[in-house]
From Swiss-Prot:
Protein name as annotated: Cytochrome c biogenesis ATP-binding export protein CcmA
Annotated GO CC locations: plasma membrane
PANTHER family membership: ABC TRANSPORTER I FAMILY MEMBER 1
GO molecular function: ABC-type heme transporter activity; ATP binding; ATP hydrolysis activity
Binding-site positions, ATP: G39, H40, N41, G42, I43, G44, K45, T46
The keyword Membrane belongs to this UniProt entry's keyword annotation: yes
Lineage: Bacteria, Pseudomonadati, Pseudomonadota, Gammaproteobacteria, Pasteurellales
Catalytic function, reaction form: heme b(in) + ATP + H2O = heme b(out) + ADP + phosphate + H(+)
Species in which this protein is naturally found: Haemophilus influenzae (strain 86-028NP)
Record SMART domains: AAA
Amino acid sequence: MFEQHKLSLQNLSCQRGERVLFRALTCDFNSGDFVQIEGHNGIGKTSLLRILAGLAQPLEGEVRWDAEAISKQREQYHQNLLYLGHLLGVKPELTAWENLQFYQRISQAEQNTDMLWDLLEKVGLLGREDLPAAQLSAGQQKRIALGRLWLSQAPLWILDEPFTAIDKKGVEILTALFDEHAQRGGIVLLTSHQEVPSSHLQKLNLAAYKAE
């Protein structure tokens, strides 16, 4: 189980170019929350996730982790965060096995070969573990990146379209993992154009905060 945490959004507004996407977004995400950020294309879902991950600045307002602004505790905050965006962070010259082994080394104190074999099976890459990532399809590269989720010890997961290029079975496996992470006291925030098959899922629609 994770310690209790809270991610607070305080009066957030977001601007892209000359256009304000949303205004006055205030809410809390607490340990155990599994939340889908909804809204039409262009409303600012990815922009919001980047703000929450500390990769972009809001027009107004601030993001707080356990009551302190993330801008004042960047290193500690990022130790508690796993962010997966559209850039996968997969090293193309490394094999699927080597990429997962690299993720394990940076996220876990102990190296466990059996865990990596089990993980290759979970992400559907058994038999392709020795191929360089550059030779794999976009969907297979996405699976390598998603392997980080099973290795992560961070309580806060921020995931931008994690189901893209993933088949129905893969979506079910990932959703079960997200449910489990939340039940252990983690926080999962994601965007998705697909239905998320979870009875624990909460939703936040940015349309309610759309700028006039």
